[in-house]
Amino acid sequence: MIPKKLKAALALAAAVAMTAVPARAEPLAKDVFGSFRASNGGPAQAIGGYSRGCAAGNVQLPESGPTWQAMRLSRNRNWGQPQLVDFLVGLSQVATQVGWQGLYIGDMSQPLGGPMVTGHASHQIGLDADIWMLPPSSLRLSPAQRESISSQSVVRGGVAPSGLWSAAHHQIIRAAASDPRVARIFVDPVAKVMMCKAERGNRGYLRKIRPIDGHDFHFHVRLSCQAGSPGCEDQAPPPAGDGCEEAAQWIRNRIDPPPAGPSDPNYRHPRSYGLSEMPRACQALVGR
């Protein structure tokens, strides 16, 4: 039998516990970085790695230019380090030399970089950009049209090029990969195989073209860390050689999938990172 006084004390403690304000959980980095609508305006600096980092001094790619349009403006992801913006403007001019009006530019980075609330694992340090495979039909699209229009795939059935793929795609991606600022370009393996088959000149740039799933509607350009960003972490260079056999193997594996390998039990998507798990300079950038 519990004494009445003890029973009353236990009841009071339970009531207090139920009404107490819970300890505030650590904010997720994606929510913190995703809340900023503008850059800090400081000196340009890429901080950390492509999938765990941030960016000081990002600049905004203008929504429209003579040879480009930024798409999906509602996402506010048309930000990047100055060298990325310069690269994209230059590549859009190259596109006009092969018969396109210019380029549709997809996601780049957020104003301060960092993890995003939706989508990408990378694109965090202002050095990544997605470029649509769809040749622009107009460079005077309204903001509403840029939300509704979609890119198109250059791959059919996962194993062959679609009717959209063209020599112009090859020339634009080759020009991008030939830029010394570019570390690698991610494309669907079918696109890489088509480039491997068609290339009759210098094949050195093909090393930078990396096959990966989910990149048939756009290609993803990644720049190397630049001088002035000592805290930027480059990836290891791509494997030696042109990588064409590797891309062909990707397609063979789609036709005849090998047994699935074990998943990495330690993998976490960057959207799950707490702010304290980001580089200290990134925590300082957002004032935490």
Where are these regions (language model features)?
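Bacterial N-terminal signal peptides that target proteins for export
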Residues: 2-10
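Bacterial N-terminal signal peptides
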Residues: 9-19
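Sec/Tat signal peptide C-region and signal peptidase I cleavage site
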Residues: 21-25
